[in-house]
């Protein structure tokens, strides 16, 4: 419970003064080891507890992990969370072992003292970011993003939207202090936005596509070109150190699933319609903006990109302390042993 409160406090203290001074001495330096003493094939658990977000998870829907792990006598359990920050809270509370989030939630979790490690990243393309938007109702008097100063903007603090808004504001010479942040999970904000009770909303698919089909959204800008390093699979540190063989299987299956999905987009759409109860037209809109570019290993280049994100949160006063991404990594030789060579770029 202590870790969960810390995480919530960090996410709540987004602008201005901080009430988190008590945290600064309590976050342990978890330190990346220079060389591995771990067996890269080790698997100690009989149950893998996976976290996923309510927006949907193809990894869960296709059950590729279950098929791979059943011969090894390992079960897979899935727990749903509203968004990335809530998933990170669940991991800190010991409810899950591994989960998928954007670039921002693990940074807030790190500040709060969570003992986590980065497992694998996500490849980006030139069009990645089309599904994440800053939007207004059609009748809004705001005509362009450059008019955003002073506006109330609704999004989930500590989510990927937090980095999106920082970079978007930076691109037009503004800072986080030039807007009024209102934190609300996307699923809750959608209803209020569709009813015209939210002036500016940051969202993504499928919520964006649902509002788009209803004719109730006008996009001010998307996140294309704002240099996010992309999302990650994150694991509890103790679990990762004791089960690197399981992480190896997870990475292999994820990478293979991305290749399958890009080659079978119609089947992915059918799964989406079935699992998320989406209208076919909404699913078409989601798929038109979605890419399956594959996974990206924890290379020095990716680590540097994630460090840049963490530094921006500190430099803009969103988090109260500077963090080092390298403190939340496994040893380099262990990554090399569990990650396909082709994705270590």
Task: For the regions a language model picked out, list residue spans one by one.
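Pocket-lining segment of extracytoplasmic ligand-binding domains
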Residues: 104, 187-275
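Conserved C-terminal helix/tail region of periplasmic/extracytoplasmic solute-binding proteins
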Residues: 311-345
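N-terminal export signals
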Residues: 6-28
